[in-house]
Amino acid sequence: MSHVDDGFRSLTLKRFPQTDDVNPLLAWEAADEYLLQQLDETEIRGPVLILNDTFGALSCALAEHSPYSIGDSYLSELGTRENLRHNGIAESSVTFLDSTADYPQAPGVVLIKVPKTLALLEQQLRALRKVVTVQTRIIAGAKARDIHTSTLELFEKVLGPTTTTLAWKKARLINCTFSHPQLADAPQTLSWKLEDTGWTIHNHANVFSRTGLDIGARFFMQHLPENLDGEIVDLGCGNGVIGLSLLAKNPQANVVFVDESPMAVDSSRLNVETNLPEAFERCEFMINNALSGVEPFRFNAVFCNPPFHQKHALTDNIAWEMFHHARRCLKINGELYIVANRHLDYFHKLKKIFGNCATIATNNKFVILKAVKQGRRR
């Protein structure tokens, strides 16, 4: 938990999921402060759009202006809602939209936290291009090290003239003025053929490894089990290639695709529809914080390629939460399979949670682990 006084109001903010007290990560950064410093409240006219507000620092500060919070992270939405409640601000003061929704017309102010991937930034800038006017004030912010020439060129190409500020507390801002530059249309998804299959994999802008199959998933796919039945889960599904493979290998199983990214879940749905339409009735698609709210003892198996980043921050909190949720939702003798970088040492984490862990396969970079939910542990 951390405190910030941004000139609009004094706030107490926390990350979601919360980090441990030994190595706490802040729920806000200097770029949030820097963005808010640029705004004179008297100049805010028209809708306020906030893009990629990680834990609600901007939304909480500008809540009295009824902002729209736009992004591709359900965790960020949950974190923002939690911080609104914690600071005594009505959740209804902020309207949440995912990045593929239609943005409000003629915004007065657009504040952008520059995302980690240029593909998501381009998708968002193209969406903004449809609604901003020459009067819209457009300001983006990030750590100075995360603003590159390619970032500025993208703003110039999609929206118009772009300048940067001096660095302040290692943060930098981008100011942009809309000028209707000519711009060719771009497809909503990036597609590629999946080797050794007849499948074409479609990827929305914010999907991990959208330009091709990542090496961890490739290794995982080589060791997926067959002859499973009942309900199984592709947890943190991304574009859904693991769940798609499980559907093909296990015709008696139903697969639940789960991710906190709406773009990931949409990509998974599209990939089942276009590659295994006959299996679509065996699928469920869920935007969720891991398996929050899912009933216990439901699944026969969970498959997971857990992230070790949250936006720009390195953290294993999300993976830790996924493992705990998986154990709660597995049936007795249900199995959790994960693939991970070897250096992350998830073996001991799983053994602590499940009381057991076995190595299924390993190479010079990745390891595949299996843990079984045993009846004696609660």
UniProtKB/Swiss-Prot annotation:
Subcellular location: Cytoplasm
Domain of life the protein comes from: Bacteria
Enzyme class: transferase
Predominant place of localization: cytoplasm
Protein EC: 2.1.1.174
Pfam families referenced in this protein's UniProt entry, alphabetically: MTS
CDD domains in the record: AdoMet_MTases
Keyword Cell wall biogenesis/degradation: no
Keyword annotations from UniProtKB, A to Z: Cytoplasm, Methyltransferase, rRNA processing, S-adenosyl-L-methionine, Transferase
SUPFAM superfamilies named in the record: S-adenosyl-L-methionine-dependent methyltransferases (SSF53335)
Keyword S-adenosyl-L-methionine in record: yes
Family classification: Belongs to the methyltransferase superfamily. RlmG family.
Role description: Specifically methylates the guanine in position 1835 (m2G1835) of 23S rRNA.
PANTHER family attached to this UniProt entry: RIBOSOMAL RNA LARGE SUBUNIT METHYLTRANSFERASE G (PTHR47816:SF5), RIBOSOMAL RNA SMALL SUBUNIT METHYLTRANSFERASE C (PTHR47816)
Protein name, entry field: Ribosomal RNA large subunit methyltransferase G
Taxonomic source organism: Salmonella paratyphi B (strain ATCC BAA-1250 / SPB7)
Gene: rlmG
